[in-house]
Amino acid sequence: MDLRASLVLITSYLFFSVAKACSNGDCKLLDPCSSNGDCQAGLYCFSCPLEFSGSRCVRSTTTNQFKLLNNTLPFNKYAFLTTHNAYAIEGEPSHTGVPRVTFTNQEDNVTRQLNEPAIDTLKEIEAFLSANPTEIVTVILEDYVQAPNGLTKVFTDAGLMKYWFPLKNMPKNGQDWPLVSDMVANNQRLLVFTSIRSKEESEGIAYQWNYMVENRYGDGGMHAGNCPNRAESSPLNDRTKSLVLVNYFPTIPFKQIACEHNSANLINMLHTCFGAAGNRWANFVAVDFYKRSDGGGAFQALDTLNGKLLCGCDDVHACVNGSTSLACNNDINVDHS
């Protein structure tokens, strides 16, 4: 066999090996792919030109920290993924008869984000809570409802009051929240916060800034190494508020660069805000286009937060079940399903 024939054979073999590297649900995280069906459970096929060429399998689901470890700790000892302006769904028409004056910054409907009238969205939340009796949903409202008891009425009409977490059980002086297991057992699985102070007294709806601190949202909150508090919030290191919310999204959402934002830069900001919050890890992390990333994305950021909160490890999968101290299993095999 001459040299040319050998090179042709070698080239053909290499092409065949690469083309057949994985398919039919066998492709792992960051493996090249051509369709969602190529990727393992918990992954999907996505292109992020800013970080890699072609398409690769990236994460599409969160880790259920309650199932992986336990739900026996206070609510503020866990972290949760938060979708910024969850109603602003690409391709979703307005249901109010007037155009929606906002940027779209999510691609999945509310049901997918959890598993335009307010009633439609709230009914989706009710359906989710009904179908998932061990799950907890937190709603943080930028509240523009002016009608007296208008917000209470829409939650009542959506059938959500049976899940309502009562105001009297919310700690105001930095104490721990009730145990998640107790919240589930008592079916108090819906936490609602409003941005209007008076509604805490008039409607029994928690005023957000009495219970949590929050960093600045938009471009002002995305400068590396700096985590300023939102204007309405107490300073991030105010320990009389036992919940911490970290925003990481630009003022104007741009989905083509969201995959870069929702990756290493996001995790770096969580570490920065940890210091700014008096060495407290975030309980909520809010992003745009939450499924877009260059690999683990917002889901890996959440695994990092829960690892830090629950056992001091860099990944929740490294936590030794039953331990609440620095007991890390560094030989981890992550199942993203």
Residue ranges and their predicted role:
Residues 2-336:
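Catalytic cores of phosphodiester-bond hydrolases, prominently lipid phosphodiesterases
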